[in-house]
Amino acid sequence: SKIPRFNNPLYISLDMDGFDPAFSPGVSHPEPGGLSSRQVIDIIQSIKTEVIGADITEYNPDRDFQKMTAFLAAKMMKEIIGKMMEK
Protein backbone atom coordinates (compact mmCIF):
# COMPACT_ATOMS: atom_id res chain seq x y z
CA SER A 1 0.00 0.00 0.00
CA LYS A 2 1.02 3.60 -0.47
CA ILE A 3 1.96 6.11 2.19
CA PRO A 4 -0.72 8.74 2.72
CA ARG A 5 0.10 12.12 1.25
CA PHE A 6 0.87 14.77 3.86
CA ASN A 7 0.70 18.53 3.31
CA ASN A 8 2.39 19.54 6.56
CA PRO A 9 5.97 18.86 7.67
CA LEU A 10 6.52 15.30 8.89
CA TYR A 11 8.29 13.90 11.97
CA ILE A 12 9.35 10.25 11.60
CA SER A 13 9.41 7.92 14.60
CA LEU A 14 10.95 4.59 13.59
CA ASP A 15 10.24 1.72 16.01
CA MET A 16 12.88 -1.01 15.58
CA ASP A 17 10.35 -3.59 16.86
CA GLY A 18 8.55 -3.26 13.51
CA PHE A 19 11.39 -4.94 11.62
CA ASP A 20 11.49 -8.68 11.12
CA PRO A 21 13.91 -10.25 13.66
CA ALA A 22 16.08 -11.48 10.77
CA PHE A 23 17.03 -7.82 10.25
CA SER A 24 16.62 -6.47 13.77
CA PRO A 25 17.18 -9.02 16.57
CA GLY A 26 18.14 -6.41 19.17
CA VAL A 27 14.66 -5.39 20.29
CA SER A 28 12.50 -6.14 23.31
CA HIS A 29 9.45 -7.27 21.34
CA PRO A 30 10.45 -9.05 18.10
CA GLU A 31 7.83 -9.07 15.35
CA PRO A 32 8.14 -12.20 13.16
CA GLY A 33 6.91 -11.31 9.70
CA GLY A 34 7.83 -7.67 10.27
CA LEU A 35 9.25 -5.29 7.70
CA SER A 36 12.52 -5.79 5.87
CA SER A 37 15.16 -3.09 5.76
CA ARG A 38 14.47 -2.65 2.03
CA GLN A 39 10.77 -2.06 2.67
CA VAL A 40 11.51 0.66 5.23
CA ILE A 41 14.07 2.33 2.95
CA ASP A 42 11.49 2.33 0.15
CA ILE A 43 8.94 3.93 2.49
CA ILE A 44 11.40 6.63 3.59
CA GLN A 45 12.41 7.37 0.00
CA SER A 46 8.78 7.63 -1.11
CA ILE A 47 7.96 10.44 1.34
CA LYS A 48 7.04 13.53 -0.67
CA THR A 49 6.71 16.12 2.10
CA GLU A 50 9.35 17.91 4.18
CA VAL A 51 10.80 15.79 7.00
CA ILE A 52 11.64 18.02 9.97
CA GLY A 53 12.89 15.49 12.53
CA ALA A 54 13.06 11.86 13.56
CA ASP A 55 13.77 9.40 16.30
CA ILE A 56 14.53 5.70 16.45
CA THR A 57 13.04 3.75 19.33
CA GLU A 58 12.99 0.29 20.92
CA TYR A 59 16.63 -0.68 20.40
CA ASN A 60 17.76 -3.16 23.07
CA PRO A 61 21.56 -3.65 23.00
CA ASP A 62 21.32 -6.56 25.46
CA ARG A 63 19.49 -8.59 22.80
CA ASP A 64 21.44 -7.41 19.77
CA PHE A 65 23.38 -10.10 17.89
CA GLN A 66 26.73 -8.85 16.56
CA LYS A 67 25.36 -5.29 16.59
CA MET A 68 23.05 -6.07 13.65
CA THR A 69 20.28 -3.85 14.99
CA ALA A 70 22.66 -1.01 15.88
CA PHE A 71 24.02 -1.00 12.32
CA LEU A 72 20.49 -1.15 10.91
CA ALA A 73 19.39 1.77 13.10
CA ALA A 74 22.40 3.79 11.89
CA LYS A 75 21.55 2.98 8.26
CA MET A 76 17.93 3.99 8.78
CA MET A 77 19.00 7.28 10.40
CA LYS A 78 21.30 7.92 7.42
CA GLU A 79 18.33 7.42 5.09
CA ILE A 80 16.13 9.71 7.18
CA ILE A 81 18.80 12.43 7.37
CA GLY A 82 19.20 12.16 3.59
CA LYS A 83 15.47 12.74 3.25
CA MET A 84 15.65 15.70 5.66
CA MET A 85 18.40 17.28 3.53
CA GLU A 86 16.24 17.30 0.39
CA LYS A 87 14.91 20.72 -0.50
Describe the predicted segments one by one.
Residues S1-K87:
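Catalytic cores of soluble, metal-dependent hydrolases
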